[in-house]
Amino acid sequence: MTSTPSSPTGPDRVPVPARLAEATRARGLVVPHITLTHRDPTRPVWGMLDPQRAWNTLWGKLCQICGQRLDDRVIVFIRSIDYLRGLAVEPGAHPECAHYSRRACPMLAGQQHHYHANPAVRFAHCEDPDCECRYWRPREPDPREPSREGRPAEAWYEAWLPITDYRIIDDPGSEHAAPAVGVDLTGVRFLKLRKIRDTAAPSTNRSPEPLDMLIASRELFGY
């Protein structure tokens, strides 16, 4: 996911941190390490993860943006549904890389209000005969989880945790959740927790966000 050059957070307006100075770019935007790309890495499929690279990034404790080893403090982008499950399925990031992503990604920046209605259209094949894009296929939805296609964007939060609490687990799933590898959030005491965008869902009959309530409790009791 990323914004277009003409958007308020386009590449000409989002400063690139020194850690990302040598990163691959497309239209001026840094291509995250875990983003699916054609054989030409400057041709990303924005918003789609490379499954193998994401898996390696999780278990290797690498940054999802720059691909380098994570340091003492890690930022993980999460939703309330992730917190309730106790699992964040995307790898963490360095604070400076996360800061860049938060401004450059339209979903995190609050500019994209709905998920793509038809993700399959982004799997178009390129003209390079050696590119593996001809093998790409949309992921089959798991019946235990609701589809996000075309649905309003959820509220997103950034959670800071020490690298000592950054544990990767292979969750077998349940009757309500598909199996997944991710960051274990169970029992983790966040160093910081803040909301970075509101949900785009209509306000009528909207349930309170569990992470909003957690933030309020942290402020009330000072932890």
PLM feature segments, named:
Residues 79-91:
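Short linker/helix segments within small regulatory modules
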Residues 66-69, 100:
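Cys/His-rich metal-chelating microdomains
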Residues 70-73, 103:
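Short, non-ligating residues that shape and space the ligands of small metal-coordination modules
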Residues 91-113:
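Short metal-binding segments enriched for Cys and/or His
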Residues 63-67, 94:
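Short cysteine-rich clusters marking metal-coordination/redox-active sites
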Residues 1-56, 134, 139-223:
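N-terminal alpha-helical interaction blocks
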Residues 56-62, 87-90:
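Short metal-coordination and nucleic-acid-contact micro-motifs, chiefly zinc-binding Cys/His arrays
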Residues 74-82, 106-111, 143:
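Short cysteine/histidine-rich zinc-coordinating motifs and their immediately flanking basic loops
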